[in-house]
Amino acid sequence: MQQTLMRSFLCALALATAITPAVQAASHAQPATMRLDYQHSGNALGEHYAVERVLVEPLPWPGSMARTLDDSNRGVNMVEVVDIKSGKVLYSRGFSTIFGEWSSTDEAKTTTRAFQESVRFPQPEQPVRVRILKRDERGLFSIVWSTDVDPKAQDVIRQQPPASVKPIPIRVSGASADKVDLLILGDGYTAAEMGSFEATARKLADHLFTVSPFRERADDFNVWAMAAPTQESGVSRPSTGVHHASPLGTRYDIFGSERYVLTTDNRALRDLAQYAPYEFIEILVNNDTYGGGGIFGQFSTAAANNDWANYLFVHEFGHHFAGLADEYYTSPVAYQSNGERQEPWEPNATALRDPAKLKWKSHVKAGTPLPTPWPKEAYDSHAREYQKERAARRAQNRPESEMSALFKADLAHTEQLFSKAPQRHAVGAFEGANYESTGFYRPEMQCIMFDRSETFCSVCQDGISTIIDLYAGTPKR
């Protein structure tokens, strides 16, 4: 009993210390958190940016001031915060965007759209230039937009309204500055369902830390949970005529994909999240239907009540947290390929232009053929039939239990097929990845990023560990 009381006291103390709701709590060591909200608009041919507002969030900067520069080389974009007077880069982080994905869809060829975006950084003492960079066709970053931010300017919003909800400490391992802070948000939960949300958040967080390398690095994480109640249970699924006004605006059918779940209401997301310490966000949608999504450096989503919620939570977090590529290629997606096979920036996919320079070559045993043979023809044949059946069942709006049974049977078939393959557990270069049947290669035959299996391949594990180190590792000198 005394141990239980002591744990409760320590959690409460850590919570009070970590989320003191006042900018005054910031110090020289931990400055305030500054946020630049902006509009990112355009189409398949071009893009534009425009400032919406600059504000100071209620909580101090959650990250380490000793690890402010990103050397991971991840993301389609990168933000740099530069001291105007000296030209010194004070802060940088790679990220990707919903606009970046949308711009490769058919709609972007005929329509111009705007998306809300934000970048957060430690509040500087002097005026800074915020630069947004984008990868070019060579994979190198170049500046596409910049704007000057004066932290002392009169139009900086310095006072936020009182928090409508408070974060729940799920896992507190230490001070936020020394840890990765993951915030689990709920969307589509009524006031009566808040207990269910907390229980699900705890269950899924616990599951995340059973999967390597999160299991071995669990002490490097803090996890918080928070949800604003809604009047109706669930989020929108337009393809079935279901529309709900959920607080975060999360919905299915993004880009016309029935399983793709995102929110495009960035302001609603950030205005709620700012009341908890966070660097990463996963949104649990209060729905049974299979679905999720993940954008590197933005957020990820998962259907909380689906039979595959554990898998969805981890798979989508892999996208958001580490910028891992999807390794599957048989499921339909809205993105349009331009036919080119440029080297992906993601750590777990390659165009294999030069096998001698394979980016995960250190994982490959001597004598492993590159490309690496696997039963691709048999896999593809089954996948075509499976995708037809899946599409037919979705068109008929069959019960989710039937869909889950289909997914389970598909995974069992894959496991049985792969069990006979000589390179079953090898690290190599297996053709078929990044939504393409040919021209892109994945590190191992099977991985959480390829199908609904339970483990990350060794290359993905390394990619995840790199990001953990960026936020919670020993600072480089």
What spans do the regions from the language model cover?
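Active-site-proximal segments of metallohydrolase catalytic domains
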Residues: D220-F296
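Catalytic Zn2+-binding segment of zinc metalloproteases
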Residues: F317-V333
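Bacterial N-terminal signal peptides
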Residues: S8-T20
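Fold-level signature of zinc-dependent metallopeptidase catalytic domains
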Residues: Q154-R215, A225-V235
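Short pre-active-site segment immediately N-terminal to the catalytic Zn-binding motif
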Residues: S196, G293-E316
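Extended acidic/polar, glycine-enriched regions
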Residues: K109-S176
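N-terminal prosegments of processed precursors
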Residues: A26-Q116
